[in-house]
């Protein structure tokens, strides 16, 4: 799936030198040996597929069981069922036609912009959606990393800005050097699902 090209950068520092104006050079597939090995050994889920704990990953299974047993995830939280209606699915594959917030046990921001969980779980805090300090803002970016992000990272660096970058696991597998650059530049990195199917 990931190809190695002799003329392509082989590390994050070399990849950072490529600019968007060099496209499609910065978007040619490249193969990081460690990432390619992890994918071939099935240590990572297949890119762009809904992830599950990999077979034989006993540590991950143990951690997942600890999370479930801790009670931090309310027992009544259920995955919204996806429906494909006329013209395709809505809200990342979840149909909100006829959605009634009062009957939903969850706080579904996509449908109602609610910010406070309805569950009686002490560990579930309301969403942070405002910055109470005047002239302050939070800077976040979703769905990275992407092959053409070098100029984006350069811009943030030039403006002396740090951001929270929500990376999709499949994108990290496909563009590991861009992911490393975000981390090396001092940004906060958060997981944004493996495949962004919802």
What are these regions (language model features)?
Residues 1-2, 141:
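Acidic/proline-rich low-complexity IDRs
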Residues 71, 78-198:
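Active-site beta->alpha N-cap acidic-glycine motif
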């Amino acid at each position: 799936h990931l190809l190695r090209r002799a003329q392509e950068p082989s590390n994050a520092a070399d990849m950072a030198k490529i600019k968007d104006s060099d496209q499609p050079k910065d978007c040619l597939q490249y193969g990081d040996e460690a990432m390619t090995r992890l994918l071939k050994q099935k240590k990572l889920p297949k890119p762009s597929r809904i992830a599950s704990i990999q077979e034989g990953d006993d540590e991950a299974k143990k951690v997942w069981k600890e999370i479930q047993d801790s009670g931090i995830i309310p027992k009544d939280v259920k995955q919204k069922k996806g429906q494909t209606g006329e013209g395709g699915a809505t809200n990342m594959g979840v149909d909100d036609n006829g959605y009634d917030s009062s009957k939903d046990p969850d706080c579904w921001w996509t449908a109602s912009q609610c910010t406070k969980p309805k569950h009686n779980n002490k560990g579930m805090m309301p969403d942070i959606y405002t910055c109470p300090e005047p002239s302050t803002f939070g800077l976040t970016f979703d769905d990275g990393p992407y092959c053409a992000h070098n100029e984006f990272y350069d811009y943030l660096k030039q403006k002396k800005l740090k951001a929270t970058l929500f990376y999709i696991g499949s994108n990290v597998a496909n563009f590991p050097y861009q992911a490393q650059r975000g981390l090396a530049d001092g940004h906060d990195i958060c997981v944004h699902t493996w495949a962004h199917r919802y």
